[in-house]
A protein has these predicted regions:
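Cationic, low-complexity basic patches in intrinsically disordered or flexible, solvent-exposed regions
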Residues: 5-9, 13
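Extended basic (Lys/Arg/His-rich) segments that typically form rRNA-contacting surfaces
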Residues: 12, 16-256
Length: 256
């Protein structure tokens, strides 16, 4: 007689779903700020060694919105960086950062409700969220001094666009031989699939195409200097993106 088969263990039984909203709020947010890449330079240490650094204009940022578990299902703090002229922003964008009169707001006021606290600042060009329990109030200003004492950061930016590139530049392939029968196809891809089966190029095959304009994160970058007077942050090494590109800076959670 065959033994009875044990029921498979459900994956969801291993997850503790009994956490309340108060328990979730206890998760603190990692330090972070928005900025703009200024460029690269080098500084000299006391022993004479030259260190390549990237200069980032970090802040000041305004807290535009606070996301809560009760209302939004998760906790986050929305930051905005770099003012944008109001004439270039739609009514929804202007109403996100400042109180403006509308039919909806009038009805809410008549019913005794409110649209919540507004930061009362200029619209922002670069807006991003930082997950976790908020450490500031709506409308407050976040400066580069928030990174004082931080040794390493993760910098996220958008890589430079290279247009339509070949497979050698895009995927770092070696190409074909320079001599011995190779003619006019030195930088070509060569064979991409078999003829009889599968008789086609499989999906996901590396080849030529659009290269760049990707979200890239450089992790565990050493903080060389924090200039609170000029809102500048100097990190060791190169940061993804062109000069003037927006970046996200977070305190790294990588060990070692």
């Amino acid at each position: 007689m065959s033994a009875e088969r044990k029921p498979e263990r459900s994956f969801w039984r291993t997850i503790d779903v009994s956490l309340s909203a108060n328990d979730l709020r206890k998760k603190t947010m990692s330090k972070g700020i928005l900025g703009r890449k200024v460029g690269m330079t080098q500084i000299f240490e006391q022993d004479g060694r030259a260190i390549p650094v990237t200069v980032i204009e970090a802040g000041p940022c305004h807290v535009l919105q606070i996301k809560t578990v009760d209302r939004d299902g998760y906790e986050a703090m929305q930051l905005g960086f770099a003012d944008k002229p109001r004439r270039l922003v739609g009514r929804a964008g202007r109403g996100h950062v400042a109180s403006i009169s509308s039919k909806r707001s009038s009805k809410l006021k008549a019913a005794g409700g409110s649209l919540g606290t507004k930061p009362e600042c200029e619209p922002k060009r670069f807006v991003r969220e930082f997950r976790g329990a908020a450490t500031a109030e709506v409308g407050s200003e976040i400066k580069v001094s928030v990174l004082d004492g931080v040794k390493s950061v993760d910098v996220t930016g958008t890589s430079k666009g290279c247009g339509f590139s070949g497979w050698m530049k895009r995927h770092n392939y070696a190409g074909q031989r320079a001599t011995h029968g190779v003619k006019k196809v030195h930088r070509h891809a060569g064979g991409t699939s078999a003829g009889t089966y599968p008789g086609r190029v499989r999906k996901g095959k590396k080849g030529a195409g659009h290269y760049g304009v990707d979200r890239v994160t450089m992790r565990n970058m050493k903080v060389v200097r924090v200039d609170t007077e000029n809102n500048l942050l100097l990190v060791h090494g190169a940061v993804p993106g062109p000069t003037g590109g927006f970046v996200i800076i977070r305190e790294t959670n990588k060990v070692g």
